[in-house]
Regions:
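Long, low-complexity intrinsically disordered regions enriched in Ser/Thr, Asp/Glu, Pro/Gly
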Residues: 1-18, 185, 191-202
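Conserved SAM-binding loop
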Residues: 7-109
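S-adenosyl-L-methionine-dependent methyltransferase catalytic module, highlighting the catalytic core
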Residues: 84-203
């Protein structure tokens, strides 16, 4: 089961379940404050001296089956080459979790995303399914990460996809760009993804 959620809901959930064994994977320097175990491909052990830190050196996560009550994967999945295997590993090591991803709009707007991200992410609200496709750069980016973070304060639902899952992560991966590549204007992406607060300016 996977469905939409919010960061606020997740923070409250974890705060109310402080006995949970929580893993944060691929968080860089911004681990969830409730995580007990941190893992990343970088050696960040000095930064997380008050946590258990494990450096990742292989695709397979170094944890037992269902070792964790909850796993956080925030802005990680879009970087992973073998995304099917990564999702299987999340399901294997934890009972449930939170996934945070950039929307297709944010992915195209941000300079750093152009070379670092491999996948576009959407969510099918009818079938409750994560829809993954090869990234296509529809237009040249115009924003920095720092600028986008400021926009997130107002337009978070338009720029960030927030999902909670339990038992399994229903998803589909389309690795071909042939069916997905269409010239999409900045205006059309804004209309599709931006919240109603901003849409009035683009009618």
């Amino acid at each position: 089961m996977i469905k939409r959620t919010s960061k606020t809901y997740i923070d409250n959930l974890l705060q109310n379940n402080i006995t949970w064994n929580i893993l944060d994977i691929g968080c860089g320097y911004n681990a969830n404050k409730f995580a007990k175990v941190i893992c990343d491909v970088q050696d960040l052990s000095n930064h997380y001296q008050d946590k258990k830190f494990i450096r990742l050196t292989e695709k397979k996560l170094p944890f037992k089956d269902k070792e964790f009550d909850f796993v956080v994967a925030s802005h990680v999945m879009e970087h992973v080459e073998d995304i099917d295997f990564f999702i299987e590993e999340l399901e294997r090591v934890s009972k449930k979790g939170y996934i945070e991803l950039p929307t297709k709009l944010e992915d195209n707007l941000v300079f750093e995303n152009k070379k670092d991200h491999l996948w576009h992410m959407d969510f099918d609200d009818v079938e409750n399914k994560l829809v993954v496709s090869k990234k296509v750069q529809y237009f040249e980016p115009v924003l920095t990460v720092s600028t986008t973070k400021k926009l997130n304060e107002v337009f978070r639902t338009s720029l960030v996809l927030e999902l909670i899952w339990e038992d399994s992560i229903n998803h589909i991966v389309n690795k071909s760009t042939e069916d997905t590549f269409k010239k999409i204007s900045v205006l059309n992406l804004l209309k599709k993804y931006f919240s109603k607060r901003l849409r009035m300016f683009f009618k």
